[in-house]
Amino acid sequence: MINLLLNEFKNFINSNASHLPPFVGDPSVISETTANVDFDIEDPKRLAQGSSFILQPGAGNATYNNRSARALTFICYDEYLTQFDDNANRYLRCRNIGRADFVAFSAQNDFQYFIVHELSVGGSSKYAKGIKQLFGTIHFLQKDPVVKEFIEQFQEIHLVLTTDSSPAPSPDEMAGGFMEPYDLIPGVIMISDNRFRAFGAKVYETKKVVLP
């Protein structure tokens, strides 16, 4: 995925904004990989520049329970797209394109999980805006046929929204819900929105993502 963002998707963005001068050079792709069972993620815009956005449980905006200790790579997708907009020269190559905070995927090439995660938290937190960012991200990524083919290899696609009011299950509830379908796991609210039907994804709101 990182190589796609460095090359293929950069070219796609340029072609999508062909009325503007192309973005030249290598784009920055900020990423971190973890195989921790329990960890948090935090919006990098809320951290000091260069700080890790993968934190100890309870220290961030959303928690992951990665029960198989699978290596997961998280990419700062918002920051990635933002660099294509040259505000000084008004070259807004990604203007009005929804962008979630993170895109993540199984790092050991087993193609188990592909995740888009939007952290719509803080004083300006809005549910509708979060949904827009999720849809805009998966829709724009899959407009590129090469990226679309890559995403469709994954066994599960998760589109996750975390807001200030998202549910957070207790440890006991999490243990009890381990083998439940996603729509029955405590602390998960499934999102029903016809715009997502084409992507074959689990779309839900939660503060704690469970990956068996």
Cite the ranges covered by each PLM segment:
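Short, flexible beta-strand-to-coil junctions
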Residues: 105-110, 164-166
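Short acidic, S/G/P-rich loop/turn micro-motifs used as interaction or catalytic elements
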Residues: 91, 121-125, 166-170
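Domain-level recognition of nuclease-like catalytic cores that cleave nucleotide substrates
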Residues: 9-12, 150-212
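Conserved catalytic cores of phosphodiester-cleaving nucleases, focusing on short active-site segments
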Residues: 102-104, 113-121
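Active-site metal-binding core of divalent-cation-utilizing nuclease and nuclease-like domains
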Residues: 62-108
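Charge-rich, low-complexity N-terminal segments
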Residues: 1-79
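Intrinsically disordered, low-complexity Ser/Thr/Pro/Gly-rich regulatory segments
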Residues: 1, 47-61, 68, 127-129, ...
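Catalytic cores of nucleic-acid endonucleases
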Residues: 124-166
